[in-house]
């Protein structure tokens, strides 16, 4: 059985991930007119720029959908977002600012939950709006087939018949109007935006050029912190975790993770926290550029890692960062539920996140400017009295340190001999050995 269908399978049921925008609206109407039986599935991901979810399935029915369903994905999305924070599953970082993989997390949830809903309806062909140059086409392909082994893929944007007839937004708008729908194109922005409750992605068009900065972006989850006319008063915030799970913000305990994430977004968004500008490597190894918002994820991540550094030892923290980067890359590639990802997730959540209990107090200012004011946890291995510079009772003596210096640094002789060997081989010279003031002596010794 062919997995990817290049042309419309007339007479068959096709599930389309329906956003209600021009692209999917025109595609749904076109498929119905060409003899297919479209079913529309809309994911409620808590998008900050969506006002009326209930209206989307109604529009799908007007455009010819056999049936239209709204699937609430918010709870699962937030659960995966918290798991990503617990595991540090983020691999794109520039200048200390992190991309929190919010789009890959959204695709993992959408790709599995929508296809599961389609399977319930006996729909085994899936279409969506992803293009062949991007990451999403592969993410949806993997998650869809993972959920339904019998799934076939039909994408209008890979169908030459569709492209020839409706290859651009102007053509799609004219098509909708000609069919009796007063569909006016939204005002063209200088970039495109995709969002869910965890974060927003701004990319393409003017943002493909690196001389276009964050200043052309209108944030949908935060504020223009770079604009000095925007008043942003400093704010003190507390974040509490219990066994790796965020449970309270500013002393308010949340039993609903969705409400907790919404509040974290509001708090961080007031300051523009979590915005970053990234050049990244797509799955196909071509570089792309995006400007990202993730105020709630950033707030929780900062507090989580503060507790992490005070609770776990150096080697555990190193493994957390190393394994987290590996996991972040797998998430980005659409492999969040693959065995290698589950193995990394299990270890990080079981042995690292389970010990993260405590409260962090921060002062948020503008953008990513903040200070940590206090860190409290019964699990802290940081003990001020152990290394106090003041006179008093100590857990170890000067003699203990002398022994440690002797035993820990027995390799100094070996290192000296290595440098001598490098100089003798001509690999180190006085002109090249910056930071090694004794290299001339080594050269003389070599002679």
UniProtKB/Swiss-Prot annotation:
Pathway(s) the chain acts in: Amino-acid biosynthesis; L-arginine biosynthesis; L-arginine from L-ornithine and carbamoyl phosphate: step 2/3
PROSITE patterns membership: ARGININOSUCCIN_SYN_1, ARGININOSUCCIN_SYN_2
Stored Pfam families: Arginosuc_syn_C, Arginosuc_synth
Top-level lineage group: Bacteria
Entry keyword annotation includes Signal: no
GO terms (BP aspect): argininosuccinate metabolic process; L-arginine biosynthetic process; urea cycle
Principal location class: cytoplasm
Catalytic activity from the UniProt record: L-citrulline + L-aspartate + ATP = 2-(N(omega)-L-arginino)succinate + AMP + diphosphate + H(+)
Annotated GO MF terms: argininosuccinate synthase activity; ATP binding; protein homodimerization activity
Amino acids binding L-aspartate: 131, 135-136
Compartment(s) where it occurs, according to its Swiss-Prot or TrEMBL record: Cytoplasm
Keywords: Amino-acid biosynthesis, Arginine biosynthesis, ATP-binding, Cytoplasm, Ligase, Nucleotide-binding
InterPro entries in alphabetical order: Arg_succ_synth_type2_subfam, Arginosuc_syn_C, Arginosuc_syn_N, Arginosuc_synth, Arginosuc_synth_CS, Arginosuc_synth_type_1_subfam, AS_cat/multimer_dom_body, AS_multimer_C_tail
Family according to the record: Belongs to the argininosuccinate synthase family. Type 2 subfamily.
Protein name, per record: Argininosuccinate synthase
Organism of derivation: Salmonella typhimurium (strain LT2 / SGSC1412 / ATCC 700720)
């Amino acid at each position: 059985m062919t997995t990817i269908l290049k042309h419309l399978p007339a007479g068959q049921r096709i599930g389309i991930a329906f956003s209600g925008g021009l692209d999917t609206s025109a595609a749904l109407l076109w498929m119905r007119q060409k003899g297919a039986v479209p079913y529309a599935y809309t994911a409620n991901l808590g998008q900050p720029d969506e006002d009326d979810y209930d209206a989307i399935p109604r529009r799908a029915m007007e455009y010819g959908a056999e049936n239209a369903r709204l699937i609430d994905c918010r709870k699962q999305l937030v659960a995966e977002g918290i798991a990503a924070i617990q595991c540090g599953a983020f691999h794109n970082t520039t200048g200390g600012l992190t991309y929190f993989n919010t789009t890959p997390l959204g695709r993992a949830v959408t790709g599995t939950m929508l296809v599961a809903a389609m399977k319930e309806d006996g729909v085994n062909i899936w279409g969506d709006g992803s293009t062949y140059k991007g990451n999403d086409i592969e993410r949806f392909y993997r998650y869809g087939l993972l959920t339904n082994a019998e799934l076939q893929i039909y994408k209008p944007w890979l169908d030459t018949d569709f492209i020839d007839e409706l290859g651009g937004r102007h053509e799609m708008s004219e098509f909708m109007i000609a069919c009796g729908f007063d569909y006016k194109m939204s005002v063209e922005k200088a970039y495109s935006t995709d969002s869910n409750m965890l974060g927003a992605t701004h990319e393409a068009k003017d943002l493909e050029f690196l001389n276009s900065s964050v200043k052309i972006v209108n944030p949908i989850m935060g504020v223009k912190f770079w604009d000095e006319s925007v008043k942003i008063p400093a704010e003190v915030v507390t974040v509490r975790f219990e066994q790796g799970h965020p449970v309270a913000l500013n002393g308010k305990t949340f039993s609903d993770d969705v409400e907790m994430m919404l509040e974290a977004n509001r708090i961080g968004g007031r300051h523009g926290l979590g915005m970053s500008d990234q050049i990244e490597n797509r799955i196909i190894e071509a570089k792309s550029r995006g400007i990202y918002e993730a105020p709630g994820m950033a707030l929780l991540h900062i507090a989580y890692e503060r507790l992490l550094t005070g609770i776990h030892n150096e080697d555990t923290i190193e493994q957390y960062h190393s394994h987290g980067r590996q996991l972040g890359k797998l998430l980005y590639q659409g492999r969040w539920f693959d065995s290698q990802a589950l193995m990394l997730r299990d270890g990080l959540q079981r042995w690292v996140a389970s010990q993260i209990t405590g409260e962090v107090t921060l002062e948020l200012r503008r953008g990513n400017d903040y200070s940590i004011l206090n860190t409290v946890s019964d699990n802290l291995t940081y003990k001020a009295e152990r290394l106090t510079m003041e006179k008093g009772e100590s857990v170890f003596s000067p003699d203990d340190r002398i022994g440690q210096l002797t035993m820990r640094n027995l390799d100094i002789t070996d290192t000296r001999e290595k440098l001598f060997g490098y100089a003798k081989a001509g690999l180190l010279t006085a002109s090249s050995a910056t930071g090694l003031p004794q290299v001339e002596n080594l050269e003389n010794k070599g002679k």
